């Protein structure tokens, strides 16, 4: 048998290493230039909160199947073997007849409920409604996750843009510091101007450090929101919005919320489920009618083996339970009233949340328009102060103040632009995406009812 040479083995080993490194690099690269759509897609797959909400559906599907199982007969196989003392005291007193000592039994018993006050039917309907309610909860969780990811995404953009502004401000102050130092050595400015310029450079350096740390924090927040492993490095591609449309009419948005918000839909389904559970509890007032049958074989050491069977229609009517059924009905009715009040409270809360998000978006939109003018004004003021300072017609404080005003207005413009996108995403979350989150039943059990 021919064996591969050492050279072939080495080439094969190098090829495997290169393939592994390329795959690892590709896997790492996948998270280095994520758009907002990419982040949302990753979060829908990796976020543990959304995965847990989806898995809850499997639990409720199992509840539905458990409730539906009562529509089918219940078969029980029973078997035993026992030994008894031959001199035992027989029923009715002592007898000269020899008693059996060993007994074996094997039998099958079956029970089919014919009527149980419709408890099984309503329990099945309640379980089915609960599954639909959980699907709305999954959609609500998905919408909330989309908002959280969008917020983290634009906060990272904000941190990056702030870092650019801070670095540009540092460069401007360093250049001004060099100019002031030259003027100070030439005797054109005082020591106070020189020291103040150096102080402004130190403050700008501190701002750059804080901006860099803010970028690291924003990346970590985004990575954890997506649900990625701690070893994965995340970065994004994106920029601040350039167009800022109005949020829309508040009344129209509210009417859309009432139709599409998944939380409201879930509350409606929970109320319907609770009303069905009242009918389940009231079913205990009615008798249960069932068909029962059994077939068995008994073997005794005296008498031999004998098959037996029994069958009949049975009715059970609990005419006294100490108030159990009445208490169950009262509990179910109370839960329904609680859900009605909860829905009323959540409608008020959602209306406030929508109004707040609408206000934030509109304020940010107006803030962008105003701050753009402020930035243009401060740029002109800074350039003018710098030109006058070079010609000795302005003091250093004028230039430094112009730098501070310009940097502050740029920060404010970034803040308003990000606030606009976050407010817009918040409105979208409250309104609801009106798209069903995909659900795949688990392999361990459960299917869509």
Task: Label each region the model flagged.
Residues 3, 9, 34, 144-256, ...:
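Periplasmic alpha-helical coiled-coil/stalk elements that build and connect Gram-negative outer-membrane
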Residues 11-22:
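Bacterial N-terminal signal peptides
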Residues 211, 262, 416:
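Metallo-beta-lactamase
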């Amino acid at each position: 048998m021919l064996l591969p040479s050492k050279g072939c083995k080495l080439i094969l080993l190098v090829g495997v290493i290169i393939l592994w490194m390329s795959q690892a690099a590709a896997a790492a690269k996948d998270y280095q230039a994520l758009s907002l759509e990419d982040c949302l897609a990753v979060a829908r797959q990796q976020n543990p909160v959304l995965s847990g909400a989806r898995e809850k559906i499997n639990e409720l599907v199992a509840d539905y199947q458990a409730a539906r199982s009562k529509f089918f007969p219940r078969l029980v196989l029973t078997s035993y073997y026992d030994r008894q003392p031959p001199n035992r005291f027989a029923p009715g007193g002592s007898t000269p007849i020899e008693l059996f000592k060993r007994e074996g039994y094997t039998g099958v018993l079956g029970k089919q409920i014919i009527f149980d006050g419709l408890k099984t039917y309503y329990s099945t309907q309640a379980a089915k409604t609960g599954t639909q309610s959980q699907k709305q909860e999954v959609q609500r969780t998905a919408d909330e996750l989309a908002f959280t990811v969008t917020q983290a995404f634009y906060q990272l953009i904000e941190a990056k843009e702030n870092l650019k502004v801070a670095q540009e401000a540092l460069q401007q102050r360093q250049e001004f510091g060099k100019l002031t130092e030259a003027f100070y050595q030439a005797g054109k400015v005082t020591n106070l101007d020189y020291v103040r310029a150096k102080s402004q450079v130190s403050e700008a350096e501190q701002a750059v450090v804080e901006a860099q740390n803010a970028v690291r924090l924003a990346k970590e927040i985004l990575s954890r929101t997506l649900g990625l492993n701690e070893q994965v490095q995340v970065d994004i591609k994106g920029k601040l919005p350039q167009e800022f449309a109005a949020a829309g009419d508040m009344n129209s948005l509210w009417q859309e919320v009432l139709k599409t918000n998944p939380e409201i839909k879930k509350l409606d389904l929970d109320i319907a489920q609770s009303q069905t559970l009242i009918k389940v509890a009231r079913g205990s007032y009615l008798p249960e009618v069932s068909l029962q049958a059994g077939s068995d074989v008994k073997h005794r050491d005296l008498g031999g083996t004998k098959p037996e069977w029994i069958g009949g229609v049975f009715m059970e009517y609990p005419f006294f339970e100490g108030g159990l059924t009445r208490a169950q009905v009262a509990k179910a009715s109370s839960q329904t009233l609680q859900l009605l009040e909860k829905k009323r409270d959540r409608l008020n809360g959602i209306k406030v949340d929508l109004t707040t998000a609408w206000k934030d978006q509109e304020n940010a939109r107006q803030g962008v328009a105003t701050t753009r003018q402020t930035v243009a004004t401060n740029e002109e003021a800074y350039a003018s102060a710098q030109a006058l300072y070079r010609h000795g017609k302005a003091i250093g404080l004028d230039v430094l103040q112009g730098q501070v005003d310009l940097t502050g207005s740029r920060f404010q413009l970034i803040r308003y632009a990000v606030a606009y996108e976050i407010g817009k995403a918040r409105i979208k979350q409250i309104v609801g995406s009106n798209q069903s989150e995909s659900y795949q039943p688990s392999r361990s059990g459960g299917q869509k009812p």
